[in-house]
A protein has these predicted regions:
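Extracytoplasmic "Venus flytrap"/periplasmic binding protein-like
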Residues: 1-24, 58-69, 170-172, 179-180, ...
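Hinge/lid segment of periplasmic solute-binding proteins
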Residues: 2-52, 102
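Short, solvent-exposed loop/beta-turn-alpha elements that line the ligand-binding surface or hinge
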Residues: 8-23, 112-137, 193-194, 208-218
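Extracytoplasmic/periplasmic solute-binding protein
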Residues: 32-47, 51, 75-128
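Extracytoplasmic/periplasmic substrate-recognition and gating elements
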Residues: 38, 62, 193-221
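Short helix-initiation/N-cap motifs at beta->coil->alpha
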Residues: 71-75, 156-170
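Glycine-centered hinge/linker elements that transmit conformational signals in sensory
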Residues: 78-80, 124-160, 206
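Alpha-to-beta junction loops
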Residues: 85-88, 174-183
Length: 221
């Protein structure tokens, strides 16, 4: 205790004036000091929303696809795309020594859509092991996409070897190598030069299950 220096009211006001939902960011950065008094200790300079699916509006329109509003609809759309001869997903887990982290994001998003936040917290704090049936259920769901050769650009063997920075390129080829790419809000930095937001690409929320009463969770970092 006592290791953090409070930032003071001027910085707090700056956050309130300039950050969307400023009070929520202040709340996340406020902790009790050694005397039990609440202190504002930090500002967020970068955050990413991870529960996003990127796609080409033209590809959707040309094929008659609509943005899904539930996970059930997303999986039905995935199957429809494959039946139409299109590849639904581009997935790339490659990241040098950090290879695999995009799968973690998939797993976290799925856990938040299949179980309560309390279960998710138990998992990420290691109170619940990775071989817990609830975690295995999420792995099986991810595997139903990533291990299906008809669902992934390059087939399942390409998932681990495709670099995450290159994975979304399939959205922009002609013909498209994939229809959708689940990745965080930072990924447009790796899109091909010259593509335009809202024209060449757009995104939708990685949806929740309509059949589960778990709200609309959003994963961030």
């Amino acid at each position: 205790m006592g290791g953090l220096v409070p930032l003071g009211d001027d910085i707090k006001q700056m956050v309130l004036d300039n950050y969307a939902a400023g009070q929520s960011w202040i709340d996340l950065s406020t902790y009790d000091d050694e005397n039990g008094n609440e202190q504002f200790n930090a500002i967020f300079f970068r955050t990413n929303v991870k529960s996003l699916v990127w796609y080409s509006p033209d590809n959707f329109e040309d094929n008659g696809y609509e943005v899904p509003s539930s996970m059930e609809e997303l999986m039905a759309l995935t199957e429809q795309m494959a039946s139409d001869g299109n590849t639904p997903w581009c997935i790339g887990l490659g990241s040098g020594a950090a290879t695999g982290w995009p799968a973690t994001d998939w797993m976290e998003d799925i856990m938040l859509r299949t179980h309560s936040p309390d279960v998710y917290d138990m998992w990420v704090s290691n109170e619940m092991p990775f071989n817990d049936p609830r975690v295995l259920e999420a792995m099986d769901f991810f595997g139903s996409i990533a291990l299906n050769d008809s669902y992934v650009n390059g087939g399942s063997k390409a998932v681990a070897t495709t670099d995450f920075r290159d994975a979304p390129n399939g959205l922009f080829t002609s013909p498209a190598e994939c229809m959708m790419h689940r990745q965080a809000s930072f990924i447009p930095a790796f899109f091909p030069e010259g593509v335009e937001a809202g024209v060449d690409y757009d995104f939708f929320y990685f949806p929740a299950f309509a059949g589960k009463d778990l709200g609309t969770p959003v994963l961030g970092a």
